[in-house]
Amino acid sequence: MNRPFNDQPIETLIDQNLANEGTVLDLRLKYISDDGMEFLSSCPKLVSLQELKLERNDITDKGIQILAGSTILTGIKSLNLERNSIGDEGVRSIALSPSFSRLTSLNLWKNEIGSDGAKAIADSLILGNLQRLDLAKNKIGDDGGKALAESQTLTSLKYVDLFGNGISQETQEIIKESLNFKNLQHLVLE
């Protein structure tokens, strides 16, 4: 297996960073890349995983597609993919994968997500339990912002961060006034 940036194999990283009786795995800044996602997605030790932190790991759409196809990681409630290289295809994989039906928190801050990725989230029947969505510092634009505001499935959201997405003032008002965000307690637009 390829060794990540910190020169430890993924097997060792999992052993060292798996916590809370196997429910939390924190691999932030380990640079496991898409190759590490292969092992992670098929590791039987992770069958009880509920929280997965993968910030800054050089993960692309390919790695997310591998994760979305996992038959082991089906109980994840919180997924942090902050500061990777995930685009619309990767987000579409998350939005369509039954493995993510329990997600309540999805952090995609500072990736490469455009309006199609935001639309995939907005249209997802899988992500109806989401309470927290962070899409800050992506490129969803007005079309992506409107799609989220018009979503019939994201009604459980309590926190949404869309800062730094090139969303116009007009679309920001549409988002603020969305009746679909009836449970929203915190909205970040600028």
Predicted regions located by residue number:
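Compositionally biased, intrinsically disordered low-complexity segments
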Residues: 17, 35, 62, 67, ...
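C-terminal capping region of solenoid repeat domains
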Residues: 1-5, 11-13, 155-190
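Eukaryotic tandem repeat interaction scaffolds
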Residues: 77-125
